[in-house]
C-alpha cells in the first residue's frame, strides 16, 4: 500500500530520514567513518556499551560450569568472550567446531546474570540435540531447559527455551 500511494519506493534503507534512526549494528562503522574523516560523534548513553571483561575471567567461569572431562578450545573461549563483551554479534563457525558449547557458555552466563534465553534452531532434531548437549556439558537440563515443539508445552519457570521458529509461530503471545 505505501508503494502504491507513492510514500515508499520499495527500497529498504539502513538510515531512516523519517525517524532519524540507524540500525544499532552499524554504529561501529559510523564511528570509524567519523574518526577517519575528523568528525565528532556523540552517542546516547548506553548505545556503545561494550564490555571489557578479561579473557581470564571467562576462562574461570567456563572451568566452573563444565564437567572436568570437557575442555574448551581457545577459539571457543574467544567467541564466548566476544559475544558477552559485545552483546550483539554474529558468530560464524564451521561444522563440527563446537558451536553448541559456545552457545551453552553464553546461555549459562545469561542464566547466571538472571536473564532468560530463547534459542531458536531450524529443526526439532536440533532441539533435542541441544537439550542433550546441555546435559552432557553439566547442566541439569530438565530443571533449566524447556523444549518447545509439538508435544511439549512451555514451562514459564525455566530460564532457557529451545525451540523451532515454526513452534514459536503457533505459540500464544
What is each stretch, according to the model?
Residues 72, 119-120:
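Conserved SAM-binding loop
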Residues 2-16, 33-36, 42-92:
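Conserved pre-motif I regulatory segment
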Residues 117, 124-152:
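Conserved helix-turn-beta segment of the N-terminal RecA-like "Helicase ATP-binding" lobe
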Residues 71, 85-110:
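Walker A/P-loop
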Residues 16-26:
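A generic structural motif
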Residues 88-90, 116-118, 159-160:
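Residue-level preference for the first positions of well-ordered beta-strands
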Residues 150-173:
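Conserved helix/coil segment N-terminal to the catalytic DExD/H
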